[in-house]
Amino acid sequence: ANIGGLGAGSWGTSLSALLHDNENEEAIWSIDPAEIEMLSKEREHKTKLPGVHISEEIQITGEIQEAILGKDFLVLAVPSPFTRATAKKMSPYVAEGQIIVDVAKGIEETTLMTLSGQIKEEIPQADVAVLSGPSHAEEVARLLPTACVIGAHTEETARFLQKLFMSAVFRVYISADMLGIELGGALKNVIALAAGIADGMGYGDNAKAALITRGIVEIARLGMKMGGRLETFSGLTGIGDLIVTCASMHSRNRRAGILIGQGKTMEEAMEEVHMVVEGVYSAKAALALGKKYHQSLPII
């Protein structure tokens, strides 16, 4: 297939490499001229994925239409706070029924919308799907075994995408519960921030296990009230993603939490992590959702 990637950070780059290894054609767009130059010249994302080679066959571009026009499907991999703005830019070039797979995780603070909801609002002609699960980019790029879930409105779209992403080391399940998948992915970042704070304060493993377990209960309670399914929250995109995010040093949310637990301010922690800490944005949205749906969320 011929694929367009939008966003050339660690996750966008890892997925491009995976899709290229699966014998697809690929063009990646970035908004950042310095990033485009580095990827084109060095064929490596020196800051975010050092040591991972990006094939010469993958086209790197600063022109958004080059990554959209005539592509079989698009992978939207920009950090969640930039989802809507990027979707606006994409809209004029997206064809009727063109598939967009969103791979970021978050909830919009102002509207409380999921990312797929924002994309659909800006690009009504698109067929929007999501990819989520316990999947640190650093490990996917190094071909370590990973399992994820594709959520789509139709089984046909889900199966089409499953076939293209699936590899010997990247296993893909499918689901129709897009809402549950997206809520699990966004809300677990908030719990990971809390787990990091507990680590930073030296609270130990018992406290962390309690946080993770009670955290998934809060996520599931709110998610089911909003229309998600229980099995989604107890699966890869719920408990699976929560475990990896709370336990791994790859997790920027956990790293930021540790720094806050050690006494740094939110701003200092985000500065030190050098990446977008999505849990910070999602925490405010999660609180507002709790109020809206009358759910008690003590950890969040």
Stretch-by-stretch model annotation:
Residues 1-52, 59-62, 89:
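NAD(P)+-binding Rossmann beta1-loop-alpha1 motif at the extreme N-terminus of oxidoreductases
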